[in-house]
């Protein structure tokens, strides 16, 4: 598919180097051709998710920062979204992200989980001020993405990305991707497209329900909260469908 080929293989364009930070973002290869049945079901049990955690790979402060940043981006989409769901933290997704981050493998995975979960990756070397610095490049893809006009979705919507990649941003603002779980791991050594990075900070963020379906727009354009799923019972918070749930995470220990 032209869409996939335009996203995968643009690795050389995704390197950003600053005075104190070197960063790479993985081209999002979780884009798929067709939505399978029962996409609302994402059975993480047995798919590389550890039953017991020895230590957490993300702090409460970083968790809140990532969640708040995602919801800020989701609430401020243009055109406005009629069905954007408020994003909450999900403990199972965080555990699955931990399991992958600790492998220190620079690719999307594990493969069996990718059928159910969306995933964005980032890796950095050097210092950074905030965990948000690790994901800001995802949201900055917005400047390359054009939301498809309803008249162009007949019925499949075109993919309108003028830059090297837009799929990190579209996963962030996918309306039904209302659950997020991330993990950060410092890899002593990791192979990044043939180069060895040492003491690299590896961020994995998993999303459910999985987004980035080819032929679909990230959300329905319209008056905020005017097309929320029935389960939200008409509740709205900051231009997003809101259930009152902030997080399903376990007590922080």
Swiss-Prot record:
It is found in: Secreted. Keywords: Glycoprotein, Protease inhibitor, Secreted, Signal. Residues 1-23 form the signal peptide. Glycans are attached at residues 28, 120. CDD domains: CAP_R3HDML (cd18815). Transmembrane segments: none annotated. GO terms for cellular component: extracellular region. The keyword Ribosomal protein does not apply. Belongs to the CRISP family. Residues 67-207 form the SCP domain. The lineage of its organism: Eukaryota, Metazoa, Chordata, Craniata, Vertebrata. Putative serine protease inhibitor. This is Peptidase inhibitor R3HDML. PANTHER family: CYSTEINE-RICH SECRETORY PROTEIN-RELATED. The keyword Signal applies. Residues 24-56 form a propeptide. GO terms for molecular function: peptidase inhibitor activity. InterPro entries: CAP_dom, CAP_sf, CRISP-related, R3HDML_CAP. It comes from Mus musculus (Mouse). Pfam families: CAP.
